[in-house]
Amino acid sequence: MIYLHAIDPIAFSLGPVKVHWYGLMYLASFGAAWCLGRQRIQAGRLLGVNMDGFSDLLFYAMMGVVLGGRVGYMLFYAFHDFLQEPLLLFRVWEGGMSFHGGLIGVLLAVAWWSRRHRLQMFDVLDFGAPLVPVGLGFGRLGNFIGGELWGKLTHNGWGVIFPRAPLSDVPAGQLAMQDVMNFVQIQEHYAAGLLGHYARHPSQLYEAFLEGLVMFIVLWLFSRKPRPRYAVSGLFALLYGVFRFLVEFVRMPDNGVYVAFGWLTRGQILSLPLIVIGLFLFWLSCRSPVLQPVPAPEVAK
């Protein structure tokens, strides 16, 4: 059954402050990461680090996600707008975060933290990789609730009508449904069955399922047994790269523009290196010893 998206992106208001569901998804992501990370610390999955050390690591990773995600969005998807108005970087309430930018931010944060604590960077990445899909899943749910990053038009029975989406898949300059009808009119047309040809793939939910649920289950189960260095990180990079590349085929390209060949998106280009890196890390893991878990110390490094 085709569904009309009518979810208010604002969860609640505190006086003049409006709290968006997307922001709550970030809080849920970090809360889940802390709980799951606690289990892995107690199981000795990060040599020489206790909960105090992990809390420190999570804080810097959070900073990497937020700062890297915002800067990455400006560089990868809105560079022209950023050059015209650099202060856009700080207007985070208008939306705009990039996974690939957030990943770079986390890598920089982990590299700094690992050096500071005299740990091997990939041991830290292997420890943290199973925690990331939960955040990805919550983030994509936030995208869906906010009615953004929609998919292409579809005739499938599970399509979703997004009032903010363009009326066609023709790149750039298209009016959105809410630009030509108010929401009451949209509801009336929907009830009369007149909007079915505007239904779109709920690509946010596809990504929440693949990048969130599926990746979490696979990585969590894979990492429960001792693995060689690089193996868990390699599996994360490979799975994310493949899943993101595939979902991009049913997701509208950023700014409605394909980068090449009339079908290749910027998201696919940014995901290809992850696939290559994942395979390379797997190759390295085959040449590395299996790391045995060590109980967490009472005092962190």
From Swiss-Prot:
Q: Transmembrane among the record's keywords? A: yes
Is Transmembrane tagged as a keyword? Answer: yes
Q: Which residues bind a 1,2-diacyl-sn-glycero-3-phospho-(1'-sn-glycerol)?
A: 140
Q: Where in the cell is it found?
A: Cell inner membrane
Instruction: Using the UniProt record, give the first listed, main subcellular location.
Output: membrane
Against PROSITE patterns, the record matches this protein to: LGT
Q: Which residues cross the membrane?
A: 10-30, 57-77, 92-112, 119-139, 202-222, 230-250, 264-284
This molecule's function is given as: Catalyzes the transfer of the diacylglyceryl group from phosphatidylglycerol to the sulfhydryl group of the N-terminal cysteine of a prolipoprotein, the first step in the formation of mature lipoproteins.
- Similarity comment: family membership: Belongs to the Lgt family.
Q: What is this protein called?
A: Phosphatidylglycerol--prolipoprotein diacylglyceryl transferase
This chain's source organism reads Xylella fastidiosa (strain 9a5c)
